[in-house]
């Protein structure tokens, strides 16, 4: 059940969705409360209330993000970062979702394309914008939709979500620890094609170790890595 300022808004408990739209158009401060219904009995949750401030934007919450710095590839090309894929999970067991967000460089590439890419970052934020950690996938994970998928799920059933993704030598976890060989660089330097007067086959990664790593959702620490 959903309440606003103590007034019940739902005729029956919400059971088939994860959202509720309040048709109230007032711009005044409002306190919303979600009360779980278990076995037909309404209960309370310690973190079940949220205060919507006066004149709040409609339809969304603004969450400040920590954008990574721009970069330059070995070929001398510059790139910038923008928010990309995101998922949610309760990483610390407090009953509130956190956001796990991927930062993608502007020079990300598909499998069929050559060229260097910037490094990919995975961040975790609270809803108030507090950054909990950042994972750097490193130079040996190419940026692109086919390379950098991740999963957020409570794998061990402890009430805290873990984060799983493909990693490689040089990936840096949320505690600053490097996975594998920190000095490895498997990116192709490329060859010069006189007929095109340009470098070809640059930046592709066709060799080197690949890993699957489970990270702590709470700290970003690498918990277990397999190859």
Model-identified regions with their sequence ranges:
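Beta-propeller-forming repeat regions
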Residues: 7, 11-227
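Conserved aromatic beta-strand anchor motif in extracellular beta-sandwich/beta-rich domains
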Residues: 2-4
